């Protein structure tokens, strides 16, 4: 590799950060960094302080975000860029605003990568009670804060996206000490980890992607939890028994496909917490939930995204 990395960048909208990050994880990138002007502001409020005043994207607050991925210098740059462009177009066809949708690339020296990408990740309050921190950062919990430790270099981001925040807030509200929680499409495992830290009797994370499963298992290890398990496969194929809560932070189309299986995996009166739903897809999801025997209890909004909490009748 000769100390060289490939950096691929997508200039996009804040709405598309999560799905575009997913593209890069699917391409087995070695790490992903996000420059979001809405997050990377120097701010003094609250116990956590960010100091990103040197980042030029601050001049464009709210206009666009930049998602960067890093690959080995030995990887096929032309192929990576071609697939990225194709996948970005697919995201746009799903109705997600991709903003400029510009794909760029560069080759950078290894020392630049090593020194640059970690500076974007600092401890962050995703709710009033829960803090997510990268594994290399020190953080002392305040009062009754719960700290989730992640390795964001492995896959699936830092857990600060709006959809993740809303799911965690819902888990805070509904998880009880005798709860069994299934996290479907678990990615980094952050939602299963949050459920376990909130006191669930058992949290199970499930994902079809072996990279996600490896990432989630590593993150579970970082948090030293014994009331959580990560499994590879489809929900009903790999999980025995039923849950009190199923949480899925995916996209609306996949949620609709999953809903019937989720109804079979829940105890009567159990809750389905789901996010990754843009405004234009809310009616589609609520209609499918009704069709599968759910009563919609909450539709929460954060930015361009929605989180639905539904109860199995």
Curated annotation (Swiss-Prot):
| Domain of life of the source | Bacteria
One GO biological process term: methylation
Q: What is its EC number?
A: 2.1.1.-
Q: Which residues form a coiled coil?
A: none
Quote the gene name from the UniProt entry: prmA
Q: Which GO terms describe its molecular function?
A: protein-lysine N-methyltransferase activity
Under the heading Pfam families, the entry gives: PrmA (PF06325)
Source organism of the structure: Clostridium botulinum (strain Eklund 17B / Type B)
EC top class, as a word: transferase
Q: Any idea what job this protein has? A: Methylates ribosomal protein L11.
Keyword S-adenosyl-L-methionine applies: yes
* The keyword Manganese is annotated on this UniProt entry: no
State what protein this is by name: Ribosomal protein L11 methyltransferase
């Amino acid at each position: 590799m000769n100390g060289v990395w490939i950096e691929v960048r997508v200039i996009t909208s804040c709405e598309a950060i999560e799905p575009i990050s997913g593209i890069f994880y699917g391409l087995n990138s070695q790490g992903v960094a996000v420059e979001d002007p809405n997050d990377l502001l120097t701010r003094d409020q609250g116990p956590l302080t960010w100091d990103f005043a040197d980042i030029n994207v601050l001049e464009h607050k709210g206009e666009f975000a930049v998602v960067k991925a890093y690959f080995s210098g030995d990887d096929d740059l032309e192929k990576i860029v071609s697939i990225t462009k194709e996948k970005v177009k697919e995201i746009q066809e799903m109705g997600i605003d991709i903003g400029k949708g510009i794909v760029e690339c560069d080759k950078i020296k290894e020392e630049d990568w090593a020194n640059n990408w970690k500076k974007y990740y600092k401890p962050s309050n995703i709710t009033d009670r829960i803090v997510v921190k990268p594994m290399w950062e020190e953080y002392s919990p305040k009062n009754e804060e719960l700290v989730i430790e992640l390795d964001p270099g492995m896959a699936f981001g830092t857990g600060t996206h709006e959809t993740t925040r809303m799911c965690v807030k819902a888990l805070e509200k509904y998880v009880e000490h005798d709860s069994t929680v299934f996290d479907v499409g678990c990615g980094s495992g952050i939602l299963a980890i949050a459920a376990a830290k909130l006191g669930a009797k058992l949290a199970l994370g499930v994902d079809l992607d072996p990279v996600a499963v490896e990432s989630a298992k590593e993150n579970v290890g970082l948090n030293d939890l014994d009331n959580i398990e990560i499994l590879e496969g489809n929900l009903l194929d790999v999980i025995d028994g039923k849950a009190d809560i199923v949480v899925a932070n995916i996209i609306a189309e996949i949620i609709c496909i999953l809903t019937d299986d989720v109804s079979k995996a829940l105890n009567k009166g159990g809750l389905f917490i789901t996010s990754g739903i843009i405004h234009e897809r809310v009616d589609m999801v609520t209609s499918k939930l009704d069709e599968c025997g759910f009563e919609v209890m909450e539709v929460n909004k954060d930015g361009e995204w929605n989180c639905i909490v539904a109860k199995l009748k």
